[in-house]
Structures are given as C-alpha cells and as structure tokens.
Curated annotation (Swiss-Prot):
Keyword Cell division set for record: no
Tissues expressing the protein: Expressed by the venom gland.
PTM-bearing positions, type Leucine amide: L13
Sections of the chain in a coiled coil: none
Function: Antimicrobial peptide with activity against Gram-positive bacteria (B.subtilis, S.aureus and L.monocytogenes) and Gram-negative bacteria (E.coli and P.aeruginosa) (MIC=1.3-35 uM). Also active against fungus C.albicans (MIC=6.3 uM). Has little hemolytic activity. Acts by disrupting membranes and bacterial cell wall structures. Binds to peptidoglycan and lipopolysaccharide (LPS). In the context of inflammation and cancer tests, is weakly cytotoxic to normal cells, induces calcium signaling but does not impact cAMP production.
Organism name: Macropis fulvipes (Solitary bee)
Annotated keywords: Amidation, Antibiotic, Antimicrobial, Fungicide, Membrane, Secreted, Target cell membrane, Target membrane
Family label: Belongs to the lasioglossin-like family.
Location of the protein in the cell: Secreted; Target cell membrane
Protein name, UniProt field: Macropin
Length: 13
C-alpha cells in the first residue's frame, strides 16, 4: 500500500 512506500521513503530520506 501507499503507507508502506511512505515508510520506506522516510527511512531513505
């Protein structure tokens, strides 16, 4: 889902 993508993005950023 989109929430998962946001979590991964926050990890990278």
């Amino acid at each position: 889902g989109f929430g998962m993508a946001l979590k991964l993005l926050k990890k990278v950023l």
